[in-house]
Protein backbone atom coordinates (compact mmCIF):
# COMPACT_ATOMS: atom_id res chain seq x y z
CA UNK A 1 0.00 0.00 0.00
CA UNK A 2 1.30 3.45 -0.95
CA UNK A 3 0.86 6.02 1.80
CA UNK A 4 -0.27 8.95 -0.33
CA UNK A 5 -3.27 11.24 -0.72
CA UNK A 6 -4.22 12.60 -4.14
CA UNK A 7 -5.99 15.93 -4.56
CA UNK A 8 -7.03 16.44 -8.17
CA UNK A 9 -7.71 19.47 -10.28
CA UNK A 10 -10.71 18.89 -12.55
CA UNK A 11 -10.76 20.84 -15.83
CA UNK A 12 -7.90 19.79 -18.09
CA UNK A 13 -6.66 17.20 -15.61
CA UNK A 14 -9.35 14.60 -14.96
CA UNK A 15 -11.62 15.77 -17.77
CA UNK A 16 -11.23 17.34 -21.19
CA UNK A 17 -13.46 20.36 -20.69
CA UNK A 18 -11.57 23.24 -22.29
CA UNK A 19 -13.58 23.12 -25.56
CA UNK A 20 -16.79 23.56 -23.52
CA UNK A 21 -15.21 26.36 -21.46
CA UNK A 22 -14.05 28.20 -24.57
CA UNK A 23 -17.48 27.90 -26.18
CA UNK A 24 -19.12 29.24 -23.02
CA UNK A 25 -16.71 32.18 -22.98
CA UNK A 26 -17.31 32.94 -26.66
CA UNK A 27 -21.06 33.12 -26.08
CA UNK A 28 -20.49 35.26 -22.97
CA UNK A 29 -18.32 37.69 -24.93
CA UNK A 30 -20.97 37.88 -27.66
CA UNK A 31 -23.72 38.48 -25.10
CA UNK A 32 -21.87 41.49 -23.69
CA UNK A 33 -20.71 42.67 -27.15
CA UNK A 34 -17.03 42.12 -26.40
CA UNK A 35 -14.33 41.25 -28.98
CA UNK A 36 -13.39 37.58 -28.71
CA UNK A 37 -9.93 36.30 -29.67
CA UNK A 38 -10.13 32.53 -29.19
CA UNK A 39 -6.37 31.93 -29.30
CA UNK A 40 -5.63 34.69 -26.80
CA UNK A 41 -8.45 33.63 -24.47
CA UNK A 42 -7.35 29.99 -24.51
CA UNK A 43 -3.77 30.99 -23.74
CA UNK A 44 -4.95 33.20 -20.89
CA UNK A 45 -7.14 30.62 -19.14
CA UNK A 46 -4.46 27.94 -19.46
CA UNK A 47 -1.88 30.24 -17.89
CA UNK A 48 -4.20 31.74 -15.28
CA UNK A 49 -7.90 30.93 -14.88
CA UNK A 50 -11.35 31.71 -16.20
CA UNK A 51 -12.07 33.68 -13.04
CA UNK A 52 -9.03 35.89 -13.58
CA UNK A 53 -10.13 36.47 -17.17
CA UNK A 54 -13.57 37.63 -16.05
CA UNK A 55 -12.03 39.93 -13.45
CA UNK A 56 -9.90 41.47 -16.19
CA UNK A 57 -13.01 42.00 -18.32
CA UNK A 58 -14.71 43.72 -15.39
CA UNK A 59 -11.80 46.14 -15.08
CA UNK A 60 -11.49 46.73 -18.82
CA UNK A 61 -15.16 47.13 -19.74
CA UNK A 62 -16.96 48.01 -16.49
CA UNK A 63 -19.19 44.93 -16.60
CA UNK A 64 -19.66 43.41 -13.16
CA UNK A 65 -17.80 40.18 -12.44
CA UNK A 66 -21.02 38.72 -11.02
CA UNK A 67 -22.91 39.29 -14.28
CA UNK A 68 -20.06 37.88 -16.36
CA UNK A 69 -19.67 34.85 -14.11
CA UNK A 70 -23.40 34.15 -14.03
CA UNK A 71 -23.65 34.15 -17.82
CA UNK A 72 -20.48 32.11 -18.34
CA UNK A 73 -21.50 29.55 -15.70
CA UNK A 74 -24.92 29.09 -17.29
CA UNK A 75 -23.37 28.62 -20.72
CA UNK A 76 -20.79 26.17 -19.40
CA UNK A 77 -23.41 24.15 -17.51
CA UNK A 78 -25.36 23.87 -20.76
CA UNK A 79 -22.29 22.23 -22.30
CA UNK A 80 -21.41 19.90 -19.43
CA UNK A 81 -22.69 16.92 -21.43
CA UNK A 82 -19.81 17.39 -23.87
CA UNK A 83 -17.16 16.93 -21.16
CA UNK A 84 -15.26 13.62 -21.39
CA UNK A 85 -12.67 11.90 -19.23
CA UNK A 86 -9.01 12.44 -19.95
CA UNK A 87 -7.21 9.34 -21.28
CA UNK A 88 -6.01 7.16 -18.44
CA UNK A 89 -8.21 8.74 -15.76
CA UNK A 90 -10.13 5.56 -14.90
CA UNK A 91 -6.96 3.48 -14.90
CA UNK A 92 -5.25 5.78 -12.41
CA UNK A 93 -8.33 6.09 -10.19
CA UNK A 94 -8.76 2.29 -10.13
CA UNK A 95 -5.09 1.84 -9.27
CA UNK A 96 -5.36 4.45 -6.50
CA UNK A 97 -8.39 2.67 -5.05
CA UNK A 98 -6.55 -0.66 -4.97
CA UNK A 99 -3.60 1.05 -3.27
CA UNK A 100 -6.02 2.60 -0.74
CA UNK A 101 -4.99 6.10 -1.81
CA UNK A 102 -7.60 8.64 -0.76
CA UNK A 103 -8.76 10.93 -3.58
CA UNK A 104 -10.19 14.45 -3.41
CA UNK A 105 -10.98 17.11 -6.00
CA UNK A 106 -10.32 20.83 -5.63
CA UNK A 107 -11.56 22.80 -8.62
CA UNK A 108 -12.71 26.30 -9.50
CA UNK A 109 -15.60 24.73 -11.44
CA UNK A 110 -18.99 25.31 -9.86
CA UNK A 111 -21.74 23.22 -8.32
CA UNK A 112 -22.40 21.30 -11.56
CA UNK A 113 -19.15 19.39 -10.97
CA UNK A 114 -21.08 16.74 -9.02
CA UNK A 115 -23.46 16.00 -11.90
CA UNK A 116 -20.55 15.72 -14.35
CA UNK A 117 -18.79 13.26 -12.04
CA UNK A 118 -22.00 11.22 -11.77
CA UNK A 119 -22.50 11.16 -15.54
CA UNK A 120 -18.90 10.06 -16.10
CA UNK A 121 -19.25 7.35 -13.45
CA UNK A 122 -16.36 8.45 -11.23
CA UNK A 123 -18.03 10.22 -8.29
CA UNK A 124 -17.52 7.23 -5.98
CA UNK A 125 -13.74 7.49 -6.25
CA UNK A 126 -13.64 10.76 -4.29
CA UNK A 127 -13.96 11.34 -0.56
CA UNK A 128 -14.88 15.00 -1.02
CA UNK A 129 -15.16 17.41 -3.93
CA UNK A 130 -14.45 21.10 -3.34
CA UNK A 131 -15.77 23.54 -5.95
CA UNK A 132 -16.20 27.29 -6.24
CA UNK A 133 -19.55 26.81 -4.47
CA UNK A 134 -17.58 26.18 -1.25
CA UNK A 135 -16.40 29.81 -1.39
CA UNK A 136 -12.81 29.21 -0.37
CA UNK A 137 -10.21 31.77 -1.42
CA UNK A 138 -9.25 30.92 -4.99
CA UNK A 139 -6.09 29.11 -6.04
CA UNK A 140 -3.19 29.44 -5.42
CA UNK A 141 -4.27 30.30 -1.87
CA UNK A 142 -3.99 27.11 0.24
CA UNK A 143 -7.18 27.64 2.26
CA UNK A 144 -9.07 24.72 0.67
CA UNK A 145 -6.10 22.38 1.06
CA UNK A 146 -5.72 23.38 4.71
CA UNK A 147 -9.42 22.65 5.21
CA UNK A 148 -9.00 19.11 3.88
CA UNK A 149 -5.86 18.55 5.96
CA UNK A 150 -7.66 19.58 9.13
CA UNK A 151 -10.95 17.80 8.41
CA UNK A 152 -9.42 14.46 7.41
CA UNK A 153 -6.24 14.66 9.51
CA UNK A 154 -4.08 14.38 6.40
CA UNK A 155 -0.29 14.52 6.47
CA UNK A 156 1.02 17.22 4.14
CA UNK A 157 4.11 15.21 3.33
CA UNK A 158 1.87 12.50 1.87
CA UNK A 159 -0.32 14.78 -0.27
CA UNK A 160 0.10 15.21 -4.02
CA UNK A 161 -1.85 17.79 -6.01
CA UNK A 162 -2.36 16.68 -9.61
CA UNK A 163 -3.07 19.47 -12.08
CA UNK A 164 -2.42 20.90 -15.53
CA UNK A 165 -1.58 24.59 -15.06
CA UNK A 166 1.00 26.76 -13.36
CA UNK A 167 -1.78 27.82 -11.00
CA UNK A 168 -2.04 24.22 -9.78
CA UNK A 169 1.70 23.92 -9.23
CA UNK A 170 1.70 27.24 -7.38
CA UNK A 171 -1.15 26.02 -5.17
CA UNK A 172 0.85 22.94 -4.20
CA UNK A 173 3.86 25.13 -3.38
CA UNK A 174 1.78 27.51 -1.26
CA UNK A 175 0.15 24.58 0.57
CA UNK A 176 3.53 22.89 1.16
CA UNK A 177 2.50 19.70 -0.63
CA UNK A 178 3.90 17.84 -3.65
CA UNK A 179 2.87 18.59 -7.23
CA UNK A 180 2.39 16.47 -10.34
CA UNK A 181 1.56 18.53 -13.41
CA UNK A 182 0.71 17.85 -17.05
CA UNK A 183 2.31 21.01 -18.43
CA UNK A 184 4.76 22.50 -15.95
CA UNK A 185 8.43 21.56 -16.02
CA UNK A 186 10.35 19.53 -13.48
CA UNK A 187 11.64 21.32 -10.40
CA UNK A 188 12.18 20.58 -6.75
CA UNK A 189 8.46 21.03 -6.08
CA UNK A 190 6.97 19.47 -9.21
CA UNK A 191 7.02 16.24 -11.20
CA UNK A 192 6.04 16.68 -14.85
CA UNK A 193 3.99 14.05 -16.67
CA UNK A 194 2.67 14.08 -20.22
CA UNK A 195 -0.31 11.78 -19.58
CA UNK A 196 -2.17 10.59 -16.50
CA UNK A 197 -0.98 6.99 -16.64
CA UNK A 198 2.54 8.22 -15.90
CA UNK A 199 1.32 8.74 -12.33
CA UNK A 200 1.58 4.96 -11.92
CA UNK A 201 5.27 5.06 -12.77
CA UNK A 202 5.93 7.80 -10.24
CA UNK A 203 4.86 5.55 -7.37
CA UNK A 204 5.62 2.04 -8.68
Q: Which positions does each model-derived feature cover?
A:
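Non-catalytic, surface-exposed connector residues within folded enzymatic/regulatory domains
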Residues: 65-69, 83, 107, 138-139, ...
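Short glycine/serine/threonine/alanine-rich loop segments
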Residues: 34, 63, 101, 154, ...
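Asp-based, Mg2+/Mn2+-dependent phosphohydrolase catalytic module
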Residues: 1-4, 30, 94-97, 110, ...
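N-terminal helical cap/lid subdomain that shapes the substrate entry/recognition surface
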Residues: 2-87, 91, 95
Amino acid sequence: MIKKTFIWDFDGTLVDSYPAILESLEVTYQHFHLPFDRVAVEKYILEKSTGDLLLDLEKAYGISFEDLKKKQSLEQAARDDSIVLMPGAIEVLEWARKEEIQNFIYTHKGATTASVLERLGISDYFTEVITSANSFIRKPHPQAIDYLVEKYQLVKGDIVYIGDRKLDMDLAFEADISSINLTQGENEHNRKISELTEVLGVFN
